[in-house]
Swiss-Prot record:
Major site of localization recorded for this protein: nucleus
Role noted for this protein: Transcription repressor. Interacts specifically with the W box (5'-(T)TGAC[CT]-3'), a frequently occurring elicitor-responsive cis-acting element. Negative regulator of both gibberellic acid (GA) and abscisic acid (ABA) signaling in aleurone cells, probably by interfering with GAM1, via the specific repression of GA- and ABA-induced promoters.
Gene Ontology terms for molecular function: DNA-binding transcription factor activity; sequence-specific DNA binding
UniProt KW keywords: Abscisic acid signaling pathway, Activator, DNA-binding, Gibberellin signaling pathway, Nucleus, Repeat, Transcription, Transcription regulation
Protein name: WRKY transcription factor WRKY24
GO biological-process terms attached to the record: abscisic acid-activated signaling pathway; gibberellic acid mediated signaling pathway; negative regulation of abscisic acid-activated signaling pathway; negative regulation of gibberellic acid mediated signaling pathway; positive regulation of DNA-templated transcription; response to abscisic acid; response to jasmonic acid
Cited InterPro entries: WRKY_dom, WRKY_dom_sf, WRKY_plant
Biased composition (Pro residues): 51-61
Domain remarks: The WRKY domain is required to bind DNA.
Pfam family, one: WRKY
Amino acid sequence: MTTSSSGSVETSANSRPGTFSFASASFTDLLGGNAGAGGGGVSRYKAMTPPSLPLSPPPVSPSSFFNSPIGMNQADFLGSPVLLTSSIFPSPTTGAFASQHFDWRPEVAAAQSADQGGKDEQRNSYSDFSFQTAPASEEAARTTTFQPPVPPALLGDEAYRSQQQQQPWGYQQQPAGMDAGANAASFGAAPFQATSSEMAPQVQGGGGYSQPQSQRRSSDDGYNWRKYGQKQVKGSENPRSYYKCTFPNCPTKKKVERSLDGQITEIVYKGTHNHAKPQNTRRNSGSSAAQVLQSGGDMSEHSFGGMSGTAATPENSSASFGDDEIGVGSPRAGNGGGDEFDDDEPDSKRWRKDGDGEGISMAGNRTVREPRVVVQTMSDIDILDDGYRWRKYGQKVVKGNPNPRSYYKCTTAGCPVRKHVERASHDLRAVITTYEGKHNHDVPAARGSAALYRPAPPAAAATSSHPYLPNQPPPMSYQPTGPQPYALRPDGFGGQGPFGGVVGGSSFGGLSGFDDARGSYMSQHQQQQRQNDAMHASRAKEEPGDDMFFQNSLY
């Protein structure tokens, strides 16, 4: 509005000079004073004003306050073309005044009798009228900037008026509801985002879209996990990672599949935690999503059923990774298919059982690692005799070595020692033997020891250096009297033994190691040794003694 600090303005309606000075009266107060003096037309116009106009005066501004001099009627001032020209509410900031008088009160009466379409048209034409002053306060500007308008159709007329009266109005922002065509898109989008935030993606500050946090999957379930493997499975484009609970002797495992962008697509658990959830776990901002998964996991445990009746942990009703869990049904987390977990897992890892190489829990929850000894020997044969008895239970080819690795277990009952034997990749003559664990028993007697199979010497010959005297005939072998179910061979492998005796209620020299189960440990060397002992005993009987030679020479 082009006004000066002091001056006179000559109008066609009133030829009296007037001097304008700035005071505390506002434009709203002038409209209210004219309503009391001039009639009811102004009150009707006041009812048509935008509902967002403040009822309290704004701060002091040179361009928004003026005062009429003494003796000048406010009704005459409102009829002056200084404020209004021949058009309906043009901008008074052009500085050009019309030459003819214009009274806006008949226009108000005509506009009040028009229909709703006329009001919308008048509002559209009124949208050009705006003050170019600074906002009343920064708080008001922020409020009007970040609060989206809500259409009257969704709120109702009364609620819409009350909301518009409560919202502050800034001069730099176009009043809500003035331009219905331009804000049509915002009227439809704002309520959808306010009421359907779960269906529509949330808009981040940078303009990107992020999935709602309630729909994200997180691997943080409150327990501590250690990753021990990852591979690409058949039928899935996402890699699969394998985790094991770090608590000592806890059998719980899980596998996690992630997409290429890092999002978790599937989490499958196996086993039940045998301990409470640790307190000092590392939590992040996604802990709320983990709580959602925990509640869903408890439902999954009660729905599908776990392996035991103990308290359920998050999504623990599913399965592990096919190492030694054979034939265990494992419904996947999130569905009730009940498909087998071990369908695509290799069978070559069944030798590794739970807790192998992981340590033994001692008093005070201390974990003691099992000792591991690696021995390298240059040999042409794979089987090396170390004094213990072993049973082979597996073989596979490991990464980095084309030579197969064989796995053995100590045959002594209750002994936890295992070993695996393989040839080095750089030298085929080098045999690498790795021992895990410690024997809890003594070294068994050697298989080739004759003391296992020889009977105790007689009491009369116990003091002699040789168990048999030179002139004593060899003991007769045991001759079975019943029918012989096995053929006896004279070559020492199935024939009669040189020493008779009964061990444990059964004859010991009658049948060979190939025919008797007790003789499975007898080797060819032992048979040969027995034959040699028998031959030496027979020669001692046949050869004459030295005393007989001297007696014959005397005669």
